[in-house]
Structure formats: structure tokens, C-alpha cells
Amino acid sequence: MAEFTSYKETASSRHLRFKLQSLSRRLDELEEATKNLQKAEDELLDLQDKVIQAEGSNSSMLAEIEVLRQRVLRIEGKDEEIKRAEDLCRLMKEKLEEEENLTRELKSEIERLQKRMAELEKLEEAFSRSKNDCTQLCLSLNEERNLTKKISSELEMLRVKVKELESSEDRLDKTEQSLASELEKLKSLTLSFVSERKYLNEKEKENEKLIKELTQKLEQNKKMNRDYTRNASNLERNDLRIEDGISSTLPSKESRRKGGLDYLKQVENETRNKSENEKNRNQEDNKVKDLNQEIEKLKTQIKHFESLEEELKKMKSKNNDLQDNYLSEQNKNKLLASQLEEIKLQIKKQKELENGEVEGEDAFLSSKGRHERTKFRGHGSEASVSKHTARELSPQHKRERLRNREFALNNENYSLSNRQVSSPSFTNRRAAKASHMGVSTDSGTQETKKTEDRFVPGSSQSEGKKSREQPSVLSRYPPAAQEHSKAWKGTSKPGTESGLKGKVEKTTRTFSDTTHGSVPSDPLGRADKASDTSSETVFGKRGHVLGNGSQVTQAANSGCSKAIGALASSRRSSSEGLSKGKKAANGLEADNSCPNSKAPVLSKYPYSCRSQENILQGFSTSHKEGVNQPAAVVMEDSSPHEALRCRVIKSSGREKPDSDDDLDIASLVTAKLVNTTITPEPEPKPQPNSREKAKTRGAPRTSLFENDKDAGMENESVKSVRASTNTMELPDTNGAGVKSQRPFSPREALRSRAIIKPVIVDKDVKKIMGGSGTETTLEKQKPVSKPGPNKVTSSITIYPSDSSSPRAAPGEALRERHTSTSNIQVGLAELTSVSNHVSSPFELSIHKHDITLQLAEAERMADGPLKDRPETVVSRSSIIIKPSDPVERNSHAPPAETIRWKSHSAPSEVGFSDARHVTVRNAWKSRRDLKSLEDPPTRIGKNVESTNSNAYTQRSSTDFSELEQPRSCLFEQGTRRVGPSSGDAPEPSSRRTQSSLTVSEVLTRRNRVGDTITVAAWNHSASMEEEGEDCTLSVYRQLHNSLDPSELPGKQGLPESGRVRAEERLRPTRPCAEEN
């Protein structure tokens, strides 16, 4: 009503206003008429004067008078009109007054209605409040029901426990009885032992007496023998003398006989004495031996009894412990019984609540209070139990506990979960107790522990059991997000620098199908291990292990411990990393024969964001070096679906301003999750081979994308760049581990598919990439702004759905969706002298779709073959270009821009679109092909260097045209150009995402030179995409070409090899940077 009345008022007021306006107009007209009348009157007066003056001319005057009369009549008629108008005005005034009164009444009505509305609103609010209260009450009721269910289940569990406790009590009683009987036996044994001891002591004393008596007898016998022998000798002498004196004449024979007889008698006597003495001695010796044996027996018995006494003491202590346990169990039982009663009361009350007998809120509050009380009680009981368990712990148990704690700490390092740590310690403690105690005691302690676990304050029984039974989720699944933060936390160890890799390598965990089962437990170590185990195994040990393929495993083992250190080390000055990279590069050259050692260097280089800056500097320095190094592409492929790990390493001398684009870029393409890092190598070392090796290393880092995209992508991309730049390029010869000593073109590296090992850990990379990749890249981009030598580092993750088909015909429609996220960091080359250097570092996050140049179809060249792809490629890329140096050869503007673009489109250009969708391998091949167009494949890497397309882009799924486009226009269209490219930067309005640009546009902008290359590259890249399900390219490329697209052609050669991987929106390296 109020609205209707207000509407009526407004309508009536409008009508009145309209009438007023018309009346005012009439009034104005009447006023004009009155003025005219006054003028006529004045004229009449004048005429009258004239008539008076000119009486003579009456006739004429009369005629005039007639005319005047007519005019007066007319004027009078007008006066009537004026009167009528005045009447109308009066009426209008009256009507207006009436309308005003009406409006006042309506206002009052409106106010009344508003008051009523306010009242109704209050009622509604009250109603909604009551509704909310009702819903809350319903929820609380449901909660209470759930609680009752839980409590009933807990009751059942408690009943079971009570039964277990009762059984344990029975067992304890039995053990007590057995112990008591054993004690009695021991007591009787001890009594018998004591009596035996007394008896034995008495025997010993008697034996001693006997021994003394025997010794005395022996001494007496000895004396008697001596006396007897003396007497016999005297008698003989006397007899001889007598015989001699009586008859010296007696025949000598008789005397001899007598002497012989006497002698025989003497001998017999002596022998008799000796035998008697010997008999006595033997008897005494035997007795002594017997006594000694008895003494030894007694001693052994005493020892046995002492050991029995100790056992008795132990048994007594155990008995006391068991009694304590029994008491604690009784207390627990009482607590449980009380809890059961409370729970029963709660259940009754809840039933009453459900029946509506008790008011809902009061019941809810009271039940809540009770629930909390039970919780506290549970805590108290748990505390008491813990006391008993502590008492039970023997030193051995404590030792076990310490061991468990260490173990738990180790687990925490890897799993980051407290639960995981606690559960093993519980189980170990229990096991230790069980081993040390008798079976009965073991069961008792287990019971107490169970109860303890049950009442652990933090968790209910079930939770405790879960924690015990299940390793933490982190331990069960590969650490993804965690690894990120962890890796950064890690201490910096040069050896550990694999930690950085670890991040990158998270995805690369599956790398080599090597032992990654262990990887999941080590969030950091995983990636490191995976990367280490992959052909890049050495990288974990960076400089140390480069020489040995076997080191991969070592790196994997050390990767976990080192991963953390590696991250920290990565933060070390990039100069450190660079020097290490150089070393690694040298080592890698030796190792090139071993495909496994290829990657190692790259991953080993720890670079943090700071390192990124250093890497950028390194890039600039490498450019300065002026060593044109062929780009080496290392592809490790264990299976088409396995992560392709391709590294395209391009080294170029920095000295050439145009060839700055040739900066060594390690482009790593992992078909699945591998991030391709293309980094112009910061290492000043001229050796292209070593750089290539190092670059190949970058691959493991690419894995970072999986989990670390948000936080880690930027850092990791930087790391990978550093690692790749520092690491020597490991050239992959075609399928053969060609020695790194010989520089390889990216095409050659691409050819060496055999070397490619799966770096990817199969993770749902698409999800990761699709959802957060762009944002993460944006976040990561921030650090990229660090000033550094001109470097473009791009981390591109491309997930081709089909990695199985190594190469897809450019015309083939790719059915897979390609999503790629790339972080591209372009550090302005601090050297302004290089004309082609991009002065602004920028990080590009490019989705593979962008990379695939899903340009707006309108813009795309109408390439049918790409359109053939049924699936639309969606690409999101965010590009942050922060110019570290405003000064750039190519007038790359320092302004930093963050550009994000998404394009959904089916590539329309045949050649370009094909290239766009081409997988990493195709991209590599395309690079080769492009190079082949420009140069023989072997020359490609060199050409790339020479072309100064240091920003040697990897496009796994990007059109070369797009890449080229990006160089000249990519950023222009897809993104606003951060800085105006020296010649190329289009207006910001033209900065549509390159994805929107047609490949042809990109190519044309870049340079026509790249077009054929891009087509070939796309064809290859398409097949590559199919092969590599997901390729993550972590490309750190310094776009040294700030050159106009015309300059780009040289770069295009790089893009051919490198761009393919680069997915280079970056491609526009210089131009792109300028545009961006």
C-alpha cells in the first residue's frame, strides 16, 4: 500500500507540476498581452491628442477611430482572457493546496507504514533468530546423538577393556600364586643350602685336622727313616771293619756276598719305608683333592644360590611392579566404571532430550559439560597410568625410548607429522617392555599402555589407534606441498644442494623409476632422490658425484639429508653456485658417457631466489664470455609416458650482443611433470659441453612444479636455472651418451631420446598446473625481480596428455588438454652493452595452453591441422617482468608488469598450431628441424648460440611461431609489454596475450626466419607432447635478444631448438621482454 500511495503521490505531484508550468506559461502570455494593451492605450491617447489637434481631418480621424475601437474591443476580449487565466490560476492554487494536503497525509501514512515495516522486520529477525536457534538445537541434538553413538561404542570398547583387564588380573593372580610357590621353594632351598653349608664347614674343619695329623705322621716317618738309614750304614761299616780285622784272608767273594746281602736288606728297608711314605702321601693327596673338589662344589653352589637370590629380588621387584600395575588397573577400572555410569546417565538424558522431556538447550549444555568432564577425567587417568608406565621403564626401556625418539625425530624430518612419530614410539616402547618382562608382565604393561593410549589427552582411543596403525598421511603419500617449505628450511650443504633440485625433482621423483618408493617418506629427499636416481643422479651431489652414474643412487640416498641443505645452499650466493656449476660442468664432461650423470649437475646446483639473481648475473657474464656454446638437449626417456626429461642447453658467448640470446639455456623438458629449465648459463666457463651437462641437471628441479608450484615454483625455477646454468650441459648424443666434451646442438640433444629417463613422479600434475600454477607463478615472480645479469629463467610445466606418441604429425589433432605453467624470470642483463639483452628480469608463468599458443582463433592463422585438436587448450600465464636494469641494448623498458593471460582456443594455424600442441619431444625435434632448416642439426646448437638467441627457448607445446611471436610480440599481445621492446614492443593495447595472437602473427612479428622452423618444431613438439604426458619446462632463459624480430631470426634458430621447449612466450626473449 505504501508503495502504491507513494506512487500515486508522485504521479499526482508530477501532474500538478505540469499544470503549474502550463499556467505560468499562460501567465507570461497574459502579461505580454497586458503590455500590448497598455501600449495600445498609449497609442489611443496619442491618437486622441492628434484628433483634437487635427479636427479638420474628421473623416480620416473617424476611420482611425473605428479602427481603434475595433482594436479596443480586441483588447477587451484579451482582458477577459486574462481574467479567465486569473481564475484558472486561482483554481490551480486551490488544487495545489489540496494536493499538498494529500501529500502530507500520504507522508504520514508512509511513516506509519514504515514503522509497521520496522516492527515486521524485528519480528522477522526474531523469527530468523529462533530459526537459527532451532537449527543449532537440531545440530546439537545430532551431535548429542553422534556423541551417544560414540560413547556407546566407547562403552563397548571399555567393556572389552574391562574384560581384558579382568583376564589380565586373573593372569596376574596366577603369576602371583606361582611366584609365591616359587618363593617358598626358594626359601626351603635356601634353608637346605644353609644346613649344607654348616655341614660342609664342619667337614672342612675335620679334614683340616686330618691333614694336620697326617702331616705330623709323615714328618715322624721321615725322621724314623733317616735314623734307620744312619744306623744301618754304621752297622755295615763296623761289620766290615770287624771282618777285615778278623780275617782279611776270607775270600773276597764271601765278603762281597755279605755286602750284597746287607745292601739288599738295606735297599729292601729303604723301599719299604719309601712305599709306606708314598702310601701316606697318596692318601693325604687324595684327601686334599677330594676336599678341594668339595670346596669348589660348595663355591659353585654358593654362586648358584646368590644368583637365585638375585632372581628372587628381581621377582620381588617384578611382583611389586605387577601389584602396582594391578592397583593402577583397578583404579582405571573404577574410573571406567564411573565413566560408564556417567555415560549411561548422559545417554538417558539424551534419550529424554530426544523425547522432548528435557528442554533442548539446558540438556545440551549439561551434556556438553558432562562430556568435557569425562574428557578431563580421561586425562587424569592417563596421567596416573603414565606414572605407572614410567615406573615400569627399566634403563633398557629408556634406551629404547631414546632410540624411538630419535627415530621419531627422523620421521618428523621427513613426514613433518607428529602423529607418525608418536605412534612408532608407542609401539616400540610397548615392544621393549614386552621383551623385557615376563609374558604376564608384558600383557599387563600392554594393558596399561592401551589404556594410556586410550586416554591420551589429545586424542580419543580411536584416534590413538589410528595414529599407531597408520603412518601419517604425509609419510604415506609423496610429500608435495611440504617439500616446498621444508626444502627452503634446509641447511645449506653444497652436497645437499640437491635439495633445491629436490623441489624441482619432486615431480621428477618418478624420474628414473629408480627407488622412489622411499622417496615419499622424504618430502625433500624425494625429489632429490628421484632426480638423483634419474640419469641426473649425480646432481644430488652436484660437483662431487658428477663423474659416476652410480652416484645417482648415492645422491638419492644423500638427497633427503642434503635436500634441505641444498635449499639453503641454493640461497648461497649464486657465485658460489656458479663456481660449483663450473666444476660440475667439468666433471660432467667426463660423465657424459654415462647418461645417468648428465642431469646430475643441474639439479645439484642449489640456487635460491638470490641465486636466481646471481644466475641472471651469471647469464650476463656467460654472454660476456663470448663463448658461443652449442645448446645441448638432454632427453632422458625411460618410456613415452615417463617424464621426458629433455634439457636443451644452449651456450653462447656473451660477447656477441646479438648472440646474447644464445646464452646457455638449459631447457629441461620433462614430458610429464618435468620442469624444463632453460637457463642461459651463468657460468662464465666457455666449455659448452660442461654447461650443457649442467643444464641437463636442471631437469630434476622441474619436478618442483607439482607440489611447490605456488611457493616453490619461483624459487625452484630460479634454482633450476642456477643449477642448469651452473651445471655443465650434458650433451645427449643421439640416444648415445656422447661425451659432453663435444658441444651438441639442441637438435642432437633432442635426438638422444634414448637418454631421456622418466623424471616425472606421476602426480596429478594437471590439477596442480590447472588450478594453482598460474597463481603460484605470479607469487614466485616476485622474487624474480632481483637484479641480475640478463637472464630469462622460465619454468614451464607442460602436461601433454599423451606422452606415448613421441612425435605427432603437426596436423594431428591433439585430444589432450595441455596446461603448462611456466615461470620465466628475466633478469635484466646488467650489461647494457649487449644490445640484445633484456634489461628487465621477469617471471612468466605460462600455462601450456598459452605455450601451445592457443591464440585467439580469430588471430590464429587458420591452420586447420591445429584446430583439428578436439580439445581446447587453456593457458594461463602470468608474466612478471621486473627490469633490474632499465638500460638495455634493445631498450627493454625496466618497468615491471605482471601479466596474466588465459586463452582457451584450439590452435588454428596448421603449422603453428601443430607446433603449439606438439609435445616437448616434438618441440625438441622441432628445434632440431628448425635448426635443420637454418642449419644442419649438429649446427643447430651452435647456430642457436651464434644466433644470439641466448634466450633459447624450450617449447614443449608452444608454437615456435608463438615463441617467436613472444619474442617480438608474444608479450605484446598476450601480455602488456613490461618494457617497450626496442623496436618490437607493441602498444600496451597490442599486448594481448600471445596466446591470442596467431602463430603466424607471432612468427611474422618475430621474424619470418623462424616460421619454417616453428612449423617443423611444432610438428615435432606435437609428437613430443603426445609422448610426454606432462612436460614441465622450467626454463630459465635470459632473453638476450632485445633485438627486434628481425634480430630474432638468429634467435629463432634457438627457438627452433630452444623455443620449442621454452614454450616461449619468453621467446620474445628480448622482444617479448620488451613488450612485456
Curated annotation (Swiss-Prot):
Biased composition (Polar residues): 410-428, 509-518, 944-960
Residues with the Phosphothreonine modification: T679, T958
Phenotype upon changing S574A: Does not affect localization to the centrosome or midbody during mitosis
InterPro entries to which the protein is assigned, alphabetical: Cortactin-Actin_Reg
Keyword list, A-Z: Acetylation, Actin-binding, Cell junction, Cell projection, Centromere, Chromosome, Coiled coil, Cytoplasm, Cytoskeleton, Microtubule, Nucleus, Phosphoprotein, Tight junction
Region of interest called Required for interaction with FLNA, as start-end residue ranges on this chain: 833-883
Gene Ontology annotations of biological process type: apical constriction; artery development; contractile ring contraction; negative regulation of cilium assembly; neural fold bending; protein localization to actin cytoskeleton; regulation of protein complex stability; stress fiber assembly
Annotated GO CC locations: actin cytoskeleton; actin filament; bicellular tight junction; centrosome; CERF complex; chromosome, centromeric region; ciliary basal body; cytoplasm
Parts forming coiled coils: 11-359
Basic residues bias locations: 368-378
Residues bearing the modification Phosphoserine: 255, 394, 425, 440, 512, 570, 574, 611, 659, 690, 745, 905, 932, 995, 1042
GO molecular function terms attached to this record: actin filament binding; microtubule binding
Assembly with partners or alone: Component of the CERF-1 ISWI chromatin remodeling complex (also called the CECR2-containing remodeling factor (CERF) complex) at least composed of CECR2 and SMARCA1. Component of the CERF-5 ISWI chromatin remodeling complex at least composed of CECR2 and SMARCA5/SNF2H. LUZP1 is detected as part of the CERF-1 and CERF-5 complexes in embryonic stem (ES) cells where it is involved in complex stabilization but is not detected in the complexes in the testis. Interacts (via C-terminus) with LIMA1/EPLIN; both proteins restrict ciliation and may work together to regulate this process.
Function: F-actin cross-linking protein. Stabilizes actin and acts as a negative regulator of primary cilium formation. Positively regulates the phosphorylation of both myosin II and protein phosphatase 1 regulatory subunit PPP1R12A/MYPT1 and promotes the assembly of myosin II stacks within actin stress fibers. Inhibits the phosphorylation of myosin light chain MYL9 by DAPK3 and suppresses the constriction velocity of the contractile ring during cytokinesis.
UniProt protein name: Leucine zipper protein 1
Species in which this protein is naturally found: Homo sapiens (Human)
